[in-house]
Amino acid sequence: MKISRRFTKAGKGPYAQIKWEKRISEIRNPDGRVVFRMDDVIVPSTWSQIATDIIAQKYFRKAGVDPSKAELWRAFVPADQQVLAGPPPREGSEHDARQVFHRLAYTWLLWGKKAGYFDSED
């Protein structure tokens, strides 16, 4: 299978064109009490607060992130954005949308390689 490059440029990481920012995600009961809160959630700056809440509350792994794989996504973060990423605030938990994107893309890549779907490494 051949997949044409569409949204990235050769030699640049997939996140180079995206501006990122830290946010807070909360769930509140009808009475106003906070039942979930995650600080320092990093998402694309163009995302709505609802999109931020969905990824933080539904898609971030809260525990069990393999330490040997947890930081692999950082290799794709441009140098000028490394400061924003910072260290993970919670051990074993995802806090950055790039971690989710990398986890999913890497899984699909491994499945595709195993099934022989790709014509080349590129």
Question: Where are the regions that the model predicts?
Answer:
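Extended catalytic cores of very large enzyme megasubunits
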Residues: 1-122
